[in-house]
Amino acid sequence: MSELPSLFNPKSQIQNPKWLSAARWLFGPGEPGYLWPRWLFLRALGFIFFTAFYSLVFQIRGLIGPQGILPASEYLQAVGQQLGARRLWYAPTLLWLASGDRALQLLCWAGLMAAVLLMLNLWPRAALVVCVTLFLSFVCAARDFSDYQSDGMLLEAGFLSCFFAPPGLRPGLGENHPPSRASLFMLRWECFRIYFESGLVKLLSGDPQWRHLTAMDHYYENGPLPDWIGWYVQQLPHRFHAAAALLTLVMELGLVWMFFLRRPLRILLFFLVTPFQIAIILTANLGFLNYLVLVLGILLLDDRCLPRMFPPLKASLEAGNSKMETGNWKLENGNPAIAPRGSAAETGPRNGQSGLWARLSPVTRHSSLVFSGLFLSWIFYNTTVLLLLYLFRSLPLPLAPVVALEPFRISNQYGLFAVMTTARYEIEFQGTRDGQNWLAYPFRYKPQDPRQPPRIHAPYQPRFDWDLWFASLGAWRQYSWVVNTEVLLLRNDSSVLSLFAGNPFPGEPPTAVRAVVWQYWFTDLRTKREEGLWWRRELRGLYAPTFERDAQGNIGVHEKPAP
């Protein structure tokens, strides 16, 4: 067998260039000082993936199924016709293989199982690869229903965690594979960017509400899906809301720089951002977004402080590790010692293969360095460029690497609540059989009945209800899926009806369906106490064209909204 190149030859490691030593330091196993934060972070990330797939189980047929609002099959067919072989890069989804109802359910349930494995610390690295691949498959095919910043956040965090997680079936804390410095930094970098870029867009948007500290005065009322805690917080005086707006700007633009400072300041930052995120979780239904940002904050901690904060966690994990390690032995200086599963002592050369193993092991290690170095550096470049473009739009930077990775949603630009909405509008679908009496289709999560309190749903992500909030802020021509929904309701389509809380026409379908828009306001404490109303509302008129079905089953436009 010919001699391996010097880069992969163990006999010539002393001749390796300095860049390889630097690559090992940056992308290879780091110092074992963040084993506990990694362990807890990955379990929590598994929970977030679980909630993401769990919410899709009940929605995916109605959203992108063959009879759904935006069928994935039709979209992929159009992409394939336009891009040919390039479609696999610009739409990286497994739904190219099949996109029927069964395939969509299989995607969701496989994602759920992979998320459970990640929560149980079984094959964490492989489980992450499956979670990211399957969630990306949905995101690439769902169009309007996956155009959320939180989806990009989860894909970026999941992909980076593939390099952060320890290998093996049951790695425990992964003492033999501490996280690389680069992967830890990149996850912290993502968390920093979520905060800092959100602060930047608030300033750069020119929104007077942030400038005058009035942005939070109606934030709880006008968000995508308010909850009852936010209703009570809304009743507090303006001074409280002005202080909350100022705190948000100080946190996002100033305090988050502590991510890059010394250990005591990073730990202090953890105790600042954690209650900040918990407060958002309690007062707004933003899906899994703030849960993910909260979980990323765990990486501000280290092994010296985290076990002290969660003593039961330490005891249970140590007990589990002692059981897992029983029976795995190696020899050290002629004496037996415990060898962790997946270590070289357990999987190393045996049965006369030591020569081949010794030659291939460096190849594997260096290939891993090259792979992780390439992608982590690529993502860092892209995200740095996107951040700089917020500040210097005409900066002449190469954008080809940014564009190339864009379909994978793993190097993103963030910016939450740049401009605060000043009013709340709600789209409501109504049907009729006689053209006179219109019955509303009840929603599962959106505000509708003024007497019903706004509930807490997060981290569940009701994508249909969320997107209706976005649609209410624009014209119906920008949101063709609203019209698609009307047409499908005229047919009593079961896939779309599953997105609603009920069907006012359980037998024969309606002869006409329309989408109207209401304006909603929170009531005050007195009105709620005396009348039991959480909301007051006023009808503003048609949102989209009214569709009707004639006796032959033909569907046409009956009435259009005023321009």
Which stretches of residues belong to each language-model region?
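Intrinsically disordered, low-complexity repeat regions of secreted/extracellular protein precursors
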Residues: 13, 320-336
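Cationic, low-complexity basic patches in intrinsically disordered or flexible, solvent-exposed regions
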Residues: 4, 12, 331, 354
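Intrinsic disorder/low-complexity segments
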Residues: 329, 340-344, 350
